[in-house]
Regions:
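Beta-strand-turn-beta hairpins that frame and shape the catalytic cleft
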Residues: 132, 165-170
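Structural alpha-helical scaffold elements that stabilize or flank donor/cofactor-binding regions
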Residues: 35-36, 67, 163
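Pocket-forming structural segment of enzyme catalytic cores
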Residues: 86-160
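Short acidic low-complexity segments
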Residues: 27-38
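Structural motif
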Residues: 43-45, 171
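Acyltransferase
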Residues: 172-197
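Extreme N-terminal starter segment of soluble prokaryotic enzymes
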Residues: 1-4
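Cysteine-nucleophile active-site neighborhood
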Residues: 48-116
């Protein structure tokens, strides 16, 4: 399967590309709206702030909205998950593909950085075999969905959304490219999920 990573200038995108390559995908990094619109699977990945990521997307924002309208699979990773939502407390609007804000963590330890158990709360083909798996997080903000789209939670002072899925849209707050065997399994699950659309 060919995976296109939407290039918005994030620094760790190449490690995500390499992880998808190890999972069996052919991977391209692109700033071309047409390529992003037509790809079999698009991934929006990276670390950083919603405002700078949204600005970095430029014309790709419209391509991602078109994908959602056409039921084409899109995965957000870390700030990519946050971009799927309406807005962020750190400033800036997201894509508005999922309803709800992104808010700063209220926990005493911010950022949430390190390994935590994933708690699957709704069956999802992307999370098959991953309930209770240790995955790696590095974030200071978390999505608060208005709709029932959360598929996994993580405990960090209080339950936080760790994964979402709504039709062809999915996102994870953890970093599969840094999550060892569990992350590799998630990426294989993602490729199988995207192949079914």
């Amino acid at each position: 399967m060919r995976v296109v990573l939407a290039d918005h200038g994030a620094g760790n995108v190449r490690s995500v590309a390499a992880a998808f390559g190890r999972a069996g995908a052919t991977v391209a990094l692109s700033t071309d709206p047409r390529e992003v619109t037509e790809a079999q699977l698009v991934v929006v990945a990276g670390v950083g702030h919603v405002r700078s990521a949204a600005r970095g997307l430029g014309a790709l924002a419209g391509a991602l909205r078109t994908r959602a309208e056409r039921d084409r699979p899109t995965l957000g990773i870390c700030v990519g998950l946050q971009l799927l939502f309406d807005e962020s407390e750190e400033g800036g609007s997201g894509l508005g593909l999922l309803r709800g804000p992104v808010r700063r963590l209220r926990a005493s330890l911010v950022p949430h950085m390190g390994w935590n158990d994933l708690g699957v709360v709704r069956a999802s083909p992307l999370l098959g075999g991953l309930d209770g798996a240790d995955v790696y997080f590095a974030h200071s903000y978390a999505a608060e969905p208005r709709d029932d789209v959360a598929t996994a939670l993580v405990e960090h002072g209080s339950p936080l959304v760790a994964a979402v899925e709504a039709g062809p849209l999915a996102g994870v707050q953890f970093h599969p490219e840094r999550s060892g065997a569990a992350g590799a399994r998630f990426l294989r699950n993602t490729l199988a999920w995207a192949g079914g659309w």
